[in-house]
Amino acid sequence: GKVFSIAKENAYIPGCTVSKSIFDGENYIIYFSMAPETDISAEIFPYHKLILVEEGSLEVYGTDGYQRELRAGEAVLTETDKPIGMRTEEGAIYTEISISKEDSMNSAIKAGEVFKLADLIPYQEGKVINMDIAHNDKMKFIIMSFDKGTGLSEHAAPGEALIFALDGEGVIG
């Protein structure tokens, strides 16, 4: 693996919205870079979108008056089967992950409500803590907290991992 910055590798292009697919199919993952004063029209999807803002601010809106402002570090799980759009005044770089209605979701996540992944899980002295956010037979999305000096032994798990550092610093490898 390699360390990289989603925001640095997906900088704004003036006046444009740019998308980069990093995983296709069910539970796709796409990076979006929206230049200042751009938008994506509201569309209806039969699945949730987990929106994780990396940089800037993003307004997630619907046609029924629904409107949520997200800043860097914040996330929202969109509702299904309702028109949802995105717009930004200052620009936004974010990750979008599709989550099927049938996928198991942690009850701490409420569709339509803004939250921070880092606030969902505590730190405890000398411990590693993990929490499932969403999963199905082919995908597992978790968050973990590591107290200073803790870690995991080298191990293998099926599939690949995309790791977001939400707080602090650590060593991978």
Segment roles from a protein language model:
Residues 39, 74-75, 83, 151:
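Residue-level marker of beta-strand positions
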Residues 86-90:
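Asparagine-centered strand-capping/turn motif at beta-strand->loop junctions
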Residues 64-81:
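Short acidic-glycine-tyrosine-enriched beta hairpin
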Residues 12-18, 25-45, 126-129, 140-157:
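Conserved short histidine dyad/triad with adjacent acidic residue
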Residues 1-28, 71-72, 91-93, 98-140:
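A short, N-terminal "cap"/entry segment at the start of jelly-roll beta-barrel domains
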Residues 47-63, 158-173:
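Glycine- and acidic-residue-biased ligand/ion/polar-headgroup-sensing regions
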